[in-house]
């Protein structure tokens, strides 16, 4: 979604970026973009999340293994001097900010630059195989296919306001080991991600049709798990940004 409503004082912009640049943004306390390199005469922020995510996934991830989508607001009074450029379809809109203007551009950022999504590259077979051997069970086939795609959402905000982190098989194994005592109360559990707080996104690997479920870290068993969506539908809604946590509806034993 872009912010071109002329009645607002700020314009919301998005920028795809890689690890090196986002580390420099973090070093600025999330207040400024770093100076352009000599071979980078133009700074390209874009006007919607979809386009930023497309670049992060198709350009940043293949080249650096990770791609980020950021969001920030810029004063309209400053930005109005630059025309909006259409770089393809009607949705492909961006600004071209000359490198020598970046200092002034940064001064007109209101608030902080926010990371809204991180994408990672395909997980190798070896990592899946090692985690499954250690756990003695398999991840859902649809989950493996998603994490072995060109780029998958590792963490980020949904358009619904939900925030989630999805785990690589190795991280899932580590979390399962740390959660060992509670995991014993959830036979067959496979941890797919977290809800950003105390909640884990899990599946019961004993049932190939089991949905993704939400459990508290202090859960005393599957009876308190809250079903979310079938694995394939969960992935589809994560990809669309429409996933929303369901907090009620625990499984009845």
Question: Which residues make up each language-model segment?
Answer:
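Active-site scaffold segments
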Residues: 43-44, 232
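Conserved NAD+-utilizing ADP-ribose enzyme module
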Residues: 2-32, 36-43, 50-118, 198
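General alpha-helical segment detector with a strong preference for membrane-spanning helices
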Residues: 51-52, 140, 208
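Short, flexible beta-strand-to-coil junctions
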Residues: 16-20, 72-78, 150, 161, ...
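Compact, glycine/acidic-enriched structural inserts
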Residues: 216-244
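A general structural signal for short secondary-structure junctions and capping/turn motifs
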Residues: 4-5, 34-36, 62-63, 181-183, ...
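A surface-exposed partner-binding patch
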Residues: 117-201, 242-253
């Amino acid at each position: 979604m872009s912010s071109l409503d002329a009645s607002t004082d700020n314009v919301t912009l998005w920028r795809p970026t890689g690890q090196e640049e986002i580390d420099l943004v973090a070093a600025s306390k999330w207040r400024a973009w770093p100076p352009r390199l000599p071979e980078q005469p133009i700074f390209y922020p874009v006007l919607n999340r979809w386009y930023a995510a497309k670049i992060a996934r198709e350009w940043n991830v293949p080249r650096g293994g990770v791609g980020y989508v950021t969001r920030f607001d810029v004063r309209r009074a400053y930005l109005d001097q630059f025309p909006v450029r259409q770089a393809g379809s009607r949705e492909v809109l961006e600004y071209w900010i000359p490198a020598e203007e970046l200092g002034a551009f940064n001064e007109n950022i209101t608030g902080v630059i926010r990371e809204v999504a991180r994408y990672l590259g395909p997980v190798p077979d070896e990592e899946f195989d090692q985690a499954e051997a250690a756990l003695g069970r398999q991840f859902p086939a649809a989950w493996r296919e998603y994490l072995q795609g060109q780029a998958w959402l590792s963490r980020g905000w949904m358009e619904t306001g939900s925030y989630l982190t999805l785990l690589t098989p190795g991280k899932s194994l580590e979390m399962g080991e740390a959660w060992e005592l509670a995991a014993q109360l959830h036979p067959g559990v496979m941890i797919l991600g977290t809800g950003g707080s105390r909640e884990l996104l899990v599946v019961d690997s004993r049932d190939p049709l089991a949905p993704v479920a939400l459990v508290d870290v202090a859960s005393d068993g599957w009876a308190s798990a809250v079903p979310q969506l079938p694995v394939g539908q969960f992935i589809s809604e994560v990809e669309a940004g429409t996933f929303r946590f369901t907090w009620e509806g625990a499984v009845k034993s």
